[in-house]
Each structure stands twice: as C-alpha cells, then as structure tokens.
C-alpha cells in the first residue's frame, strides 16, 4: 500500500511503503502547531522531512519494477499450498498466471488513465478528476475497508505465528505440536489477551509517529523476511517431500497421493475455487501503489514514453512476481502434499524435530508484520480525513482515533483468526473493485467514448466476470463461517 498518495498500498504487503514516500518526494502528514491540526493537503515540507531540493527523481525501469514487485510480495505468498490440494498443483499455477495477466491488463488501464491527468499523482485525485467527487468518496470508502481488513488480518496472524515461534524455540520437548502448546498455555485468556493489549499499545505508539520516513527500516525487514523464508522453504522442500513419500504416501491409498491435476475438490460443496481465486486477487492487489511509481516517469518523460516505460516495468514486475508465486506454490505444496497447513510457515517439523531455520523465519516474519502494520494505518487515517474532515484531523482526535481503531481491530483479531478467510473477504469484496473495476472505469471514461462500443463492453464484461468470481468467493466464505 502506498502512503505516498495518502491512500494505501496493498499487501498484504506494505514493507516498502515508506520508501515510496521518500523516493517520490510527495506530500506528507504535517502537524500545524498553530491550529493543532494535521493538514494532509499542505504541499510544503517541514523540518521533520529535512528537504533540500524539490527536484523529482528520475525513475528507472529497474527501480519501478522492484517497487511494483515488492508491493505485491508479502505473507500471502506462503498461503497457496493448502489451495493446491483442492485445485491441483498444475491448475493452481494456471489460475495464478491468469490472475497475473488480469493484473497487468488492469494496471496498464490505470496508467493510461493517469497519463491524461497531468497534475494528479494519486489514486483519489485521478478518480475525482475523471469520474467526479462521488466516485472519489466511493473509492475512499473501499480503501478504508481495505485498511481495516488488513490490520485485523495481520494482527490475527501475528499471535499464532509468534506462538509457533515460542513453542518451536523453547517448548518443543514439552509440547511437540503448536496445538498442544496452545491448549496448555498460549491459547489461554491470561496469556492471549495481555499479549494483544500490549502489542496493540506498541502499535498505537508507532502509528502516532509524525514522520513516517522513520519507519523506512520496516522495508528491509519485510523484504528480508519474505526472501529468507522463501529460500528456507525452497531448500527444505526436497527433504520434506522425501519424508512424506517414506512415511505418509501409500501407493494403494489414493487419498495419500499428491493432487497434481485434479480440480474436482475445488468444485465440491464448499466451492473452494471461488475462495482460492479471491485469495489470488488479494495476492496481486497492488494497483493503488502504481500511481506514485508512475509519477516518476510522468514528470521526466513525454506522455507516450512515460506510459511505455511504465508498461514495461509492470510487465517485468508481473513476470517476476508470478515466478516467485509459482516457486512458493510448488515448494510449499511439496513440503506437505497430504495435510498442508494454511501457511507453510505453520508446518510441523519432520519427526517432531527442531527446525531452526523455520524458527528464525517465524520470528522474522512476526517482526516484519508488526512493523508493517502502520503502513496500513496511515492511509486509513488519511482516507477517513479525505471523506469526513476535509483533509484535517485535530491532534486530540488523531490520538483517540488511533487507539480506538487499533484496539477494535485487535479485539476482532483475537476472536477471529482465520487468515485465509480474511484474504477471501479482502479479495472478494474489496480488491475486485479497487484493483479491477475502478481502473478500467477510469480508462474507459478517459477515452471520451461511449461505453456501449463493443470493445468497451467487452472490457466491462471481463471485469464483471472477475467481480462475480470475487463476490462469490466472499459469500462462500461467509457461509463457511456461519456453518463452522
């Protein structure tokens, strides 16, 4: 999620958010000591940002590719193994590639629309200029929902992930599995709720930081955590697969066989196909982050050349992101084809031994999630300001809103911790509108053509199919929650 345009940068995955702000030199949150308000519309920079010159940096294809790739990468990359069991490994990879193509198509539509707004660099302003204030309000409402959902999802993930780190690092002999540890200690109210209260208090302090550039280090933690964990999964998947073949696989029992190409399970009563597609929509959600990245090209190149370079960067980023997703899908699936965990970093170690490298990964990911959370809160607050307070928030309101928001999200996360369901809700009810519908509508409206032309109707029909798939995934998830 990009904080540079006062919106958000999706995830799940905000490790480089503050870096985008620093590189593109866009406006920041300014505390006005005279009227004790935060004015998000001020253009000048204060001492906390220490500006030296107002020269926009010249974007490169390599830099833009890296930034777009990093926007898409996050902990969702480790959630695909469980879907491979129902989809079939091959078909899940096919679906991933299809979503990647959709991702490239809709991003380029947003870029073309943005190229026609010379004085606008952020999602909200572009939306208002092309489609009016009402659509900007609609967009900001979706951004608010997105930020809330991501904060709750990450808080819900931190608790069991950190618990697995504690269990595997210090209690492995006494409690061989996390379930044993959770039943005996970690899941007890006297541990769980103080943990959430303390964690949320620290989060509130981070969210009240005036200069978000001070959180730049979270970018390196986030990128390092994902790369390290992916590397561990890649290196170890062979030994885990050999263990599975030796101890679990039974030639006569097909239920123990890996599911390579059978997609029937995804279409059974729980309709896991739609939930899996909604998860993929979330994994590729990066569209609001493209506008500040494209701004670097727009400032320094002609319109045609800037669009061409951004399209090329998007293509490279999509290919790289998809390659990393496929590697994660294959390696995570091979780690445990029979009973995969919701996240591969939840996996049980072989022979109940101590997997030191995965223990480190769990600690690393937990830290990255915590320091990434402000990247979802800042755009939430700014979207609230855009919609309800004309871009200004008093200091007292800021403090109260921060604590209330964080603790409400933590309270929900403490009782509802189904990570894959969070991703289905985000992808099914929010991402399809923010990442698919609105960019395509911006493009079609910027063309000054009738929407009834056959090629425009074809694009709208394609988006409609994606929305139906996403919403169905969200509805199926609700039904599962009600049943369970």
What are these regions (language model features)?
Residues 2-79, 103-108:
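Membrane-interface "cap" regions at the ends of multi-pass membrane proteins
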């Amino acid at each position: 999620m990009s904080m540079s345009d006062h919106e958000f940068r999706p995830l799940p995955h905000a490790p480089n958010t503050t870096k985008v702000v620093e590189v593109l030199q866009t406006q920041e949150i300014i505390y006005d000591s005279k009227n004790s308000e935060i004015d998000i519309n001020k253009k000048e920079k204060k001492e906390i940002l220490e500006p030296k010159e107002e020269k926009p940096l010249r974007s490169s294809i390599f830099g833009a590719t890296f930034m777009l790739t990093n926007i898409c990468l996050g902990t969702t990359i480790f959630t695909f193994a469980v879907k491979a069991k129902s989809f079939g490994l091959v078909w899940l990879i096919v679906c991933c590639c299809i979503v990647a193509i959709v991702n490239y198509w809709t991003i380029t539509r947003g870029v073309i629309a943005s190229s026609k707004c010379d004085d606008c660099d952020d999602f909200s302003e572009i939306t208002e200029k092309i489609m009016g204030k009402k659509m900007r309000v609609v967009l900001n409402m979706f951004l608010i929902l997105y930020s809330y959902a991501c904060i709750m999802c990450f808080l819900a993930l931190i608790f069991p992930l950190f618990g697995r780190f504690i269990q595997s690092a210090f209690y492995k002999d006494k409690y061989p599995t996390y379930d044993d540890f959770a039943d005996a200690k970690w899941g007890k109210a006297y541990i769980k709720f103080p943990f959430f209260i303390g964690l949320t208090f620290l989060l509130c302090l981070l969210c009240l930081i005036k200069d978000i550039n001070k959180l730049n280090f979270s970018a390196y933690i986030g990128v390092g955590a994902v790369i390290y964990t992916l590397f561990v999964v890649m290196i170890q998947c062979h030994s885990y697969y050999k263990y599975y073949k030796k101890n679990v696989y039974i030639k006569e029992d097909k239920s123990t066989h890996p599911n390579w190409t059978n997609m029937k399970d995804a279409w059974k009563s729980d309709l896991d196909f739609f939930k899996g597609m909604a998860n993929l929509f979330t994994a590729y959600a990066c569209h609001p982050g493209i506008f500040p990245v494209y701004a670097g090209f727009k400032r320094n190149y002609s319109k045609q050349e800037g669009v061409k370079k951004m399209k090329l960067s998007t293509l490279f980023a999509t290919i790289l992101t998809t390659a990393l997703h496929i590697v994660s899908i294959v390696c995570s699936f091979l780690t445990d084809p029979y009973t995969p965990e919701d996240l591969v970093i939840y996996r049980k170690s072989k022979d109940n031994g101590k997997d030191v490298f995965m223990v480190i990964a769990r600690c690393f990911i937990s830290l990255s999630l915590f320091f990434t959370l402000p990247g979802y809160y800042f755009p939430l607050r700014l979207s609230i300001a855009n919609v309800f307070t004309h871009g200004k928030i008093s200091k007292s309101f800021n403090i109260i809103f921060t604590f209330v928001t964080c603790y409400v999200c933590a309270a929900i996360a403490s009782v509802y911790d189904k990570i894959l369901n969070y991703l289905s809700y985000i992808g099914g009810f929010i991402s399809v509108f923010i990442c698919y519908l609105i960019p395509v509508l911006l493009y079609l409206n910027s063309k000054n053509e009738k929407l009834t032309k056959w090629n425009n109707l074809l694009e709208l029909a394609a988006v409609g199919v994606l929305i139906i798939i996403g919403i169905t995934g969200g509805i199926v998830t609700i039904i599962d929650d009600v049943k369970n």
